[in-house]
A protein has these predicted regions:
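N-terminal presequence-like segments and the immediate start of the first folded domain
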Residues: 1-71, 77-129
Length: 129
């Protein structure tokens, strides 16, 4: 069975998708950006990353996971040099857990003010080892 989860407390999708899909104890989280609930976007990458990670945490919990259950994360940056900013922040969120990871520089995100987007896969905690 496929379960789709829309999270009312985070930025709502701007297209035809949902925040989280869960099937067979696998969790897929759609791309999350650093836009606040009031549609404001901080100017700096660190604050945008923190907003995206806050929403990421909300999505994980709604699907029965947490940061320790993440198996793969993809981070999209509009400036690859910003990895120096987000790498220490990733350690704050993930701690000793090291999921598989891909970091990509992209020419643009959905809004030209956006600097970072995160998407991921995880497993439900009851299946985590």
């Amino acid at each position: 069975m496929i379960k789709r989860i829309q999270i009312p407390d985070i930025l709502q999708p701007v297209s035809h998708y949902c925040h989280v899909v869960e099937a067979n104890n696998i969790i897929w989280i759609s791309g999350l950006v650093g836009m606040n609930y009031n549609n404001s976007i901080p100017e700096n990458t660190k604050d945008q990353f923190d907003i995206a990670m806050r929403d990421f945490d909300t999505c994980l919990k709604a699907a029965g996971g947490d940061f320790s259950s993440v198996t793969k994360v993809r981070v999209f940056l509009t400036n690859i040099d910003d990895r120096k900013i987000i790498n220490p922040k990733r350690i704050e969120y993930f701690g000793e857990h090291k999921p598989a990871s891909t970091l990509l520089e992209v020419s643009a995100l959905v809004d030209p003010r956006m600097k970072v987007e995160i998407e991921a896969e995880a497993i439900k905690l009851k299946w985590a080892w």
